[in-house]
Amino acid sequence: FRFIDEIIELDSEHIVAQYVFPEDADFYRGHFPGRPITPGVILIETMAQAGVVAFGIYLYALEFSAEEVENMLTVFTDASVDFSGQVLPGDRVTTTGRLKFFRRKKLKAEVEMRLDDGTVVCSGELSGMGVPR
């Protein structure tokens, strides 16, 4: 599963990515019947895919050879997230990740997810690291 439709901005300091949650996504069936909302764990995964995985691959590519990057896997290690809104089926979200630190293949990013109307849905810090495949 991939929760990035498009990367809008990407440099050594930040990433901005967008995703539209499909109305027929399987996780809506039981969460919640008659009033589906996107589970928090899916929102964290969405932010991690942009703010840790995609951002991390970019940062690795600045420091390591293409072969080393190809043989690296980014694993999610830590999350501290506050939720302040909800994401409904069909909503488009924009996730921003800002670099807090990157060294020894370890990345920590400040992340934030917003709806198209600017409402902040969740924010916090996520961490991950590159490991050999």
Please name every model-derived segment.
Residues 14, 86-133:
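HotDog/MaoC-like acyl-thioester-processing domains
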Residues 1-3, 75, 93, 107:
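Hydrophobic core residues within well-ordered beta-strands of beta-rich domains
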Residues 1-38, 42-43:
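Catalytic strand-loop segment that frames the active site of acyl-thioester-processing enzymes
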Residues 38, 43-57:
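Active-site- and interface-proximal helix/loop "cap" or "latch" segments in soluble metabolic
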Residues 52-96, 121:
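Hydrophobic beta-strand-centered segment that forms part of the acyl-chain substrate-binding groove
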Residues 8, 20, 82, 127-129:
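Generic structural detector for well-ordered beta-strands
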Residues 22-23, 27, 32, 70-71, ...:
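Residue-level signal for pocket-adjacent positions within structured domains
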